[in-house]
């Protein structure tokens, strides 16, 4: 099958060792290791710690911030102790190979109408198994869209129209939202009789999150459905079944397109199993697929945990956020499918090492140190590293080592161009980090617009997309990066989305440690409004930006590969997961912990 073969317990993915030897390297690792810096020699690394109480020079004290104290990792080395049974993995793979043709037969059945096939596609998407039949689905929808008017004529079922609108939009076909006019009365409002159609209301609520700036009816649909669904779940006299009520509550808490795909699938499988008349073959296939994916995730976490433990940065640099497993969850956002396993490992590694760099700029280094570090990074060289204190040499050396390791992995795959592109984007983002650090150390509160010009650069969504592209086999790298480097609208608005969500979510933490360079704070100061008022305004900006992301996703299908666009749409789904209730990445206890537990620790029972 097309899914990757992982040798459990072995440090390899796609049969490529995670550490490949090479005589040539783009990165100055060896020079750094052998430069005249005793504290960086491997034999002494384990003895070095950054102590917040250590004495600092006058330069160190210049514009310094209070040392942050993040909670320790929830996971530690847990995944190193998790045993994976290769026989169970092989059995899962065999069952998937046996069940997949049966599922495909249902999709391709000549006895099914176009409408039935589209509803089936929606089910496959919901349960996380549509990727197995991507070509078949695209062919079906391309054919069906040519006769859409005939398919929907006379259709008065809200759930069916909503499903069709969602599925066509998800695959790049522009179904007009005029199809929803049939559900509005003479006053232009949605008919109150719809509120008794619980499934139709829920489906309309979900698809309303895929609205674009010009689709005003989607805003009306969202308000209409949310109000009635909230009333439904808060009442005691509901006629909806308990499992449907729970499903509605989950959707109100975090709607489908504000959630990571695999988390949606995990919840939907449990819901679908309780539906009367569910398809046993498709349900079994979805369960097998989830457990198969989970095997991959745990193996990836075993590999990552060993890598992170060997780096030992959590003890050497105790001011950083030790969030390796959370970084893997972030990497699941763009792609959850098994064949992107190598990509997730790469994304998680770069994300984690950039968290180290970000925390150093944000919360620990003094302004002179920030400037010296930035100079080294802009040159991508250690020539000026003598200006750095020992702990910054560890930060710099670790970044060079990680990128050098990835370069060695990518060389035999012919993907060095992708790694070079990521390096250039790291230079851009760290230069912006310096500007924000300067504002923070000097107490400068800029205007909101001035802040956003720099803040969007630190958001790094172009960087994140580039990380994702490294591990993808199904793209043309030159075309993908030419498009990415053209600064397309979808990336601009993704970047703004992250900046807005992050600044609202991290406001309390950042202000408490003296970081005034925060978008929410800048807005409050500029307009003289309360935190609550500023939060509402930034949320409006966020919602608008997301609509543009959806619009650009739709408008770009004729010149940008679907696999590239999907990464962007999926990245947009990450932000609400982590930032709707504070800073879920930095403080994952609670919701994020629950999500990680459901994905990594609990397989779905097959019977």
From Swiss-Prot:
InterPro entries: Isoprenoid_synthase_dom_sf (IPR008949), Terpene_cyclase-like_1_C (IPR034741), Terpene_cyclase_plant_C1 (IPR044814), Terpene_synth_N (IPR001906), Terpene_synth_N_sf (IPR036965), Terpene_synthase-like (IPR050148), Terpene_synthase_metal-bd (IPR005630), Terpenoid_cyclase/PrenylTrfase (IPR008930). Mg(2+) 2 binds at residues 358, 362. GO terms for molecular function: magnesium ion binding; terpene synthase activity. It is found in: Cytoplasm. Pathway: Secondary metabolite biosynthesis; terpenoid biosynthesis. SUPFAM superfamilies: Terpenoid cyclases/Protein prenyltransferases (SSF48239), Terpenoid synthases (SSF48576). Disulfide bonds: none annotated. Signal peptide: none annotated. Keywords: Cytoplasm, Lyase, Magnesium, Manganese, Metal-binding. Mg(2+) 1 binds at residues 358, 362. Its cofactor is Mg(2+); Mn(2+). The Asp-Asp-Xaa-Xaa-Asp/Glu (DDXXD/E) motif is important for the catalytic activity, presumably through binding to Mg(2+). This is Terpenoid synthase 29.
């Amino acid at each position: 099958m097309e899914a990757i073969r992982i040798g459990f317990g072995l440090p390899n993915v796609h049969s490529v060792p995670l550490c490949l030897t090479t005589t040539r390297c783009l990165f100055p690792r060896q020079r750094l290791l052998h430069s005249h810096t005793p504290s960086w020699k491997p034999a002494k690394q384990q003895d070095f710690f950054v102590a917040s109480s250590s004495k600092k020079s006058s330069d160190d004290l210049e514009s310094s911030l209070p040392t942050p104290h993040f909670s320790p990792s929830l996971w530690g080395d847990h995944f190193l102790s998790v045993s994976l049974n290769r026989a169970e993995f092989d059995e899962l793979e065999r069952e998937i190979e046996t069940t997949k043709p049966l599922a495909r037969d249902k999709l391709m059945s000549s006895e099914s109408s176009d409408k039935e096939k589209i509803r089936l596609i929606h089910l496959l998407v919901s349960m996380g198994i549509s990727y197995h039949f991507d070509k078949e689905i695209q062919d079906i929808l391309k054919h069906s869209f040519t006769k859409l008017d005939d398919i929907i004529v006379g259709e008065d079922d809200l759930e069916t129209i909503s499903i069709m609108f969602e599925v066509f939009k998800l695959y790049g076909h522009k179904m007009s939202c005029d199809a929803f006019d049939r559900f509005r009365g003479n006053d232009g409002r949605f008919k109150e009789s719809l509120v008794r159609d619980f499934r139709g209301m829920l489906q309309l609520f979900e698809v309303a999150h895929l609205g674009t700036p010009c689709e005003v009816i989607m805003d009306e649909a969202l308000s209409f459905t949310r109000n009635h669904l909230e009333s439904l779940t808060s009442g005691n006299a509901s006629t909806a079944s308990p499992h449907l009520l729970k499903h509605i509550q989950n959707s109100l808490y975090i709607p489908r397109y504000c959630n990571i795909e695999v988390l949606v699938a995990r919840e939907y499988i449990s819901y679908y199993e309780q539906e009367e008349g569910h398809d046993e073959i498709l349900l079994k296939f979805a369960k097998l697929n989830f457990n198969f994916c989970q095997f991959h995730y745990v193996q990836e976490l075993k590999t990552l945990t060993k890598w992170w433990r060997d780096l030992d940065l959590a003890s050497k640099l105790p001011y950083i956020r030790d969030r390796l497993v959370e970084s893997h969850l972030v990497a699941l956002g763009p792609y959850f499918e098994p064949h992107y396993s190598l990509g997730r490992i790469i994304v998680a590694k770069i994300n984690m090492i950039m968290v180290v760099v970000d925390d150093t700029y944000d919360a620990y280094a003094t302004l002179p140190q920030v400037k010296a570090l930035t100079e080294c990074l802009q040159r991508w060289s250690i020539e000026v590293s003598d200006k750095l204190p020992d702990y910054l040499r560890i930060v710099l050396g670790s970044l060079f080592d990680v990128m050098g390791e990835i370069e060695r992995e990518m060389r035999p795959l012919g993907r060095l161009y992708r790694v070079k592109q990521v390096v250039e984007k790291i230079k851009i983002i760290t230069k912006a980090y310096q500007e924000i650090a300067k504002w923070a150390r000097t107490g400068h509160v800029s205007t909101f617009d001035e802040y956003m010009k720099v803040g969007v650069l630190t958001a790094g969504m172009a960087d994140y997309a580039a990380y994702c592209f490294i591990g993808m086999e199904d793209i043309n790298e030159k075309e993908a990066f030419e498009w990415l480097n053209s600064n397309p609208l979808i990336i601009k608005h993704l970047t703004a989305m992250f900046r807005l969500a992050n600044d609202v979510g991290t406001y309390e933490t950042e202000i408490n440690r003296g970081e005034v360079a925060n978008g929410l704070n800048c807005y409050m100061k500029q307009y003289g409004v309360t935190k609550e008022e500023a939060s509402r305004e930034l949320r409006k900006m966020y919602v608008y930006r997301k609509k543009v992301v959806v619009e650009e996703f739709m408008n770009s299908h004729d010149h940008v590969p679907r696999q590239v666009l999907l990464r962007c749409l999926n990245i947009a789904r990450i932000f609400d997961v982590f930032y709707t209730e504070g800073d879920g990445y930095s403080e994952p206890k609670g919701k994020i912990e629950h999500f990680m537990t459901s994905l990594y620790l609990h397989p779905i029972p097959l019977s």
